[in-house]
Amino acid sequence: MLYLIYGVDKAGEEGRALRAAMREAHFTYLEEHARIIVLGGATLTDRPDDTRTGSVLIVNVASRAEADAFANNEPFHKAGLFARYTVTRMRRGQWNPAGAPKTAEGD
C-alpha cells in the first residue's frame, strides 16, 4: 500500500534549527529504509534561496501500522520539527518516470 507522509515545518528559527540539527539523522534513517521509499523530498519556498518548508515522502508498505511506525520514528518528526504532519493512504494514478527531473532541483 502507498502512503503519503507530509510534514510542514515549524516557522522561523525554531524550524530551521531543528531541521539543521536532525538533517544527518534524517538522511541516515531514509537510507536505512530505502527499500520502502518510492519518492521523497523537501518542500520549498519560491524564493531564490530555496528555503525548506517541509517534507514529503511516499512509502510502499504492507499496512497502515507499518506506515505509522515509519512516520513516527522519522527523526524530523521525533524531534518536533513539524507544525503539521499527516500520513494518508493513496493510490497511484499517473506514473511517468520519464517525466521526472534529471536533478534534485528539477530541469
Where are these regions (language model features)?
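Conserved, structured core segments of small domains
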Residues: 1-107
